[in-house]
Amino acid sequence: MAYPFELGFQDATSPIMEELLHFHDHTLMIVFLISSLVLYIISLMLTTKLTHTSTMDAQEVETIWTILPAIILILIALPSLRVLYMMDEINDPSLTVKTMGHQWYWSYEYTDYEDLNFDSYMIPTSELKPGELRLLEVDNRVVLPMELPIRMLISSEDVLHSWAVPSLGLKTDAIPGRLNQATLTSTRPGLYYGQCSEICGSNHSFMPIVLEMVPLKHFENWSSSML
């Protein structure tokens, strides 16, 4: 989860988020090197007294500054496309959960079970227990098995919402009349927090998401108790 004054991303909990972090570091280094080079050239231009007024054209220089940016863009685009296709790939999910956004709460339906569905509301600050997080706790957590591919079907009953869990690398729009899908796989157990990430009205900040990733045996016991 996030911490106060955190400057980086949350710890990756899924293979997709790990790939996103690697791509971020790769792209950030390229941007840093380009910015440093530009600042160095600007500082030289401002401080040097040397001039060159006899140059009418420079084919070699023009060739270099055309080819070099193209190579840099390719070095950014190829890993970006790889991560993009990984995020859209869904192979034989073990479980499917349908998520519906409402003003201002989420409802969940486990489609592999006949009557396993519930609404998830934020717990008001006045009802929080010691150690619970303000504006992030819910009355019904989404319990899911870890280390298994899970398909999330995401839509909305009213306005545009967005279902996002940063530590899993997930952010999918919930659009009325349209069913979007995303895949998540958690590599370790724990509680993972998210929030609606699309402004959806006056209580937009009060519809958090809490995923509880547990071993498969614990999930089976939980699902049996809910039916």
From Swiss-Prot:
Keyword annotations of the record: Copper, Electron transport, Magnesium, Membrane, Metal-binding, Mitochondrion, Mitochondrion inner membrane, Respiratory chain, Translocase, Transmembrane, Transmembrane helix, Transport
EC number: 7.1.1.9
Broad EC category: translocase
Segments passing through the bilayer: 15-45, 60-87
Record-listed Cu cation A2 binding positions: 196, 198, 200, 204
Annotated GO biological process: ATP synthesis coupled electron transport
Family: Belongs to the cytochrome c oxidase subunit 2 family.
Protein name: Cytochrome c oxidase subunit 2
Organism encoding this protein: Sciurus carolinensis
